[in-house]
Amino acid sequence: MNLIPTVIEQTNRGERAYDIYSRLLKDRIIMLGSAIDDNVANSIVSQLLFLEAEDPEKDISIYINSPGGSITAGMAIYDTMQFIKPKVSTICIGMAASMGAFLLAAGEKGKRYALPNSEVMIHQPLGGAQGQATEIEIAAKRILSLRDKLNQVLAERTGQPIEVIERDTDRDNFKTAEEALQYGLIDKVLTRNTEEQK
């Protein structure tokens, strides 16, 4: 059962009820709190585009608590984050794993955060193939190409040499918030909610 809290806001016209995500969106906060698939990506991309149309000069914050998911869906979010004019701040709450970690690192440099007890996990893309040998070969080439693309972006975002990224993403690589900071995946470990991150 998926319960979504409702908040009541008093206005001069009376009361207005919002689901919590719509209320957060008014403050330019987007929640990524699930596995990343096409539906989640479409929702995040739509919110980013909406907030850009509302005010292209004001920052957007994405709070991430995600085990990762589809590479193509994640890349749709990544490309939109880079495409829109507002700066996109990313904040890890809980866990940012796989594509979740990639999106965390994709935030505006200087505005990528994690809470003290959150974890970040990077690894190489997962995939499988079945069918004829040629189909398996095509799938293998594609996943290797995706791995190279993701590693290149991570190297650019973290400042780590590509060889270090390749080595460190070979297997599941878990990092504390402090370790993610040292690695360059984030820019600061947050202990208090301050205006500095907005």
Curated annotation (Swiss-Prot):
It comes from the Bacteria. Its EC number is 3.4.21.92. Belongs to the peptidase S14 family. It is found in: Cytoplasm. Signal peptide: none annotated. GO terms for molecular function: ATP-dependent peptidase activity; ATPase binding; serine-type endopeptidase activity. The active site is at residues 98, 123. GO terms for cellular component: cytoplasm; endopeptidase Clp complex. Its main location: cytoplasm. It comes from Bacillus pumilus (strain SAFR-032). PROSITE patterns: CLP_PROTEASE_HIS, CLP_PROTEASE_SER. Keywords: Cytoplasm, Hydrolase, Protease, Serine protease. This is ATP-dependent Clp protease proteolytic subunit. InterPro entries: ClpP, ClpP/crotonase-like_dom_sf, ClpP/TepA, ClpP_His_AS, ClpP_Ser_AS. One of its GO terms (biological process) is protein quality control for misfolded or incompletely synthesized proteins. Fourteen ClpP subunits assemble into 2 heptameric rings which stack back to back to give a disk-like structure with a central cavity, resembling the structure of eukaryotic proteasomes. It catalyses: Hydrolysis of proteins to small peptides in the presence of ATP and magnesium. alpha-casein is the usual test substrate. In the absence of ATP, only oligopeptides shorter than five residues are hydrolyzed (such as succinyl-Leu-Tyr-|-NHMec, and Leu-Tyr-Leu-|-Tyr-Trp, in which cleavage of the -Tyr-|-Leu- and -Tyr-|-Trp bonds also occurs).
